[in-house]
Amino acid sequence: MINVQNVSKTFILHQQNGVRLPVLNRASLTVNAGECVVLHGHSGSGKSTLLRSLYANYLPDEGQIQIKHGDEWVDLVTAPARKVVEIRKTTVGWVSQFLRVIPRISALEVVMQPLLDTGVPREACAAKAARLLTRLNVPERLWHLAPSTFSGGEQQRVNIARGFIVDYPILLLDEPTASLDAKNSAAVVELIREAKTRGAAIVGIFHDEAVRNDVADRLHPMGASS
């Protein structure tokens, strides 16, 4: 589902006289369907850069990032913008602890929107969104309110529900359980396990050792030549 070959990325710090900061050096990674691979390494080892490159947020300087999109393999390094948009809609999902939404949109709408965008009827989208919000312990009294009024933890759980609303073949998880209590972390772990069971290829960053041990099929060490 994911095949990364010899990806390198150097950031140029223009505000610091063009200082070059190498982050990835010929990084390679393969992830199969139904597998959760956790990127593991010290701060600055390139975990976030690789994860964001898998979502085409960063463009590597060299190498290939091949992902299975329907019946075809697509290299995200060379894919046109319209293809990246298409891939994000149906193939690659991103789940993080941060929620960025239009202030007046209700939590239920925020969660169901990605599924609506795939053409699923509104009633079915709303029902699935409600199930996810319930599982993630977001009180029903909040569903029709704007998440901008919520606590940080409530916003985080809304964002996790949004990330899991579509059954993406590939899931990228950026610290989804950071700051969550044990009960809500367990709910997220269960969602990850279910995604694995249906065959999703998952790449994640988890600093919570207990969660990492629960979900990881293997750790992928990151470093100077990851």
Swiss-Prot record:
<dbReference type="GO" id="GO:0015716">
    <property type="term" value="P:organic phosphonate transport"/>
</dbReference>
<dbReference type="InterPro" id="IPR027417">
    <property type="entry name" value="P-loop_NTPase"/>
</dbReference>
<keyword id="KW-0067">ATP-binding</keyword>
<dbReference type="InterPro" id="IPR012701">
    <property type="entry name" value="CP_lyase_PhnL"/>
</dbReference>
<dbReference type="GO" id="GO:0061694">
    <property type="term" value="C:alpha-D-ribose 1-methylphosphonate 5-triphosphate synthase complex"/>
</dbReference>
<dbReference type="GO" id="GO:1904176">
    <property type="term" value="C:carbon phosphorus lyase complex"/>
</dbReference>
<protein>
    <recommendedName>
        <fullName>Alpha-D-ribose 1-methylphosphonate 5-triphosphate synthase subunit PhnL</fullName>
        <ecNumber>2.7.8.37</ecNumber>
    </recommendedName>
</protein>
<dbReference type="InterPro" id="IPR003439">
    <property type="entry name" value="ABC_transporter-like_ATP-bd"/>
</dbReference>
<dbReference type="InterPro" id="IPR017871">
    <property type="entry name" value="ABC_transporter-like_CS"/>
</dbReference>
<dbReference type="GO" id="GO:0019634">
    <property type="term" value="P:organic phosphonate metabolic process"/>
</dbReference>
<dbReference type="GO" id="GO:0016887">
    <property type="term" value="F:ATP hydrolysis activity"/>
</dbReference>
<dbReference type="GO" id="GO:0019700">
    <property type="term" value="P:organic phosphonate catabolic process"/>
</dbReference>
<dbReference type="GO" id="GO:0061693">
    <property type="term" value="F:alpha-D-ribose 1-methylphosphonate 5-triphosphate synthase activity"/>
</dbReference>
<feature type="domain" description="ABC transporter">
    <location>
        <begin position="2"/>
        <end position="226"/>
    </location>
</feature>
<dbReference type="InterPro" id="IPR003593">
    <property type="entry name" value="AAA+_ATPase"/>
</dbReference>
<comment type="function">
    <text>Together with PhnG, PhnH and PhnI is required for the transfer of the ribose triphosphate moiety from ATP to methyl phosphonate.</text>
</comment>
<feature type="binding site">
    <location>
        <begin position="41"/>
        <end position="48"/>
    </location>
    <ligand>
        <name>ATP</name>
    </ligand>
</feature>
<keyword id="KW-0808">Transferase</keyword>
<dbReference type="Pfam" id="PF00005">
    <property type="entry name" value="ABC_tran"/>
</dbReference>
<dbReference type="GO" id="GO:0005524">
    <property type="term" value="F:ATP binding"/>
</dbReference>
<keyword id="KW-0547">Nucleotide-binding</keyword>
<comment type="similarity">
    <text>Belongs to the ABC transporter superfamily.</text>
</comment>
